């Protein structure tokens, strides 16, 4: 039989769990948003308390029914770090057409929530989500922080857009993210260096971290929330949001 003491014990365990420097309970809710007639499912995660809080939207990688990264775990980790987190699963199409609109719907939704400080909005993007985060930051001026992890090697990323990105940028990649089945053999490390160079040449505020080789495939470093990189993500977000 579950007792009142058991309930208190569970709450205590939740309240002392710490990730990214913030301790406290968090709440996760399922959301459904409309984007061009597509019903997109997602997870909204909130720290305990009333806010207003800074907010971060996570753009996952992959395409079609294959999801790259860990959307729900990242959402929960953001809340445990003191942010409102939103991870929205984009339309299940492999071509990227329409995916930027999905990303925009996510940011617009989080920005209008009462418990969110609309002046402190950040975006994290992994792989294809990193490409979308780049495109999104180049077209809007209301983002205060941008984290791009293992960005997809794709000619749709326009290096000339670097000058249009106002938000500070954190670029993350693993040393051995140099070609695998997940990237169709493309060299993500080399491409990320080009992204970093474009931002530097444009005079942008950029931090660029290359992590040591991760297992047999550096792209998989960001498949889960791992302390190797997450501590840098939360440090960066807290310094700008």
Task: Please report, for each region that a protein language model flagged, where it lies by residue.
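N-terminal cap/lid segment of alpha/beta-hydrolase-fold proteins
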Residues: 24-50
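Alpha/beta-hydrolase active-site loop
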Residues: 94-114
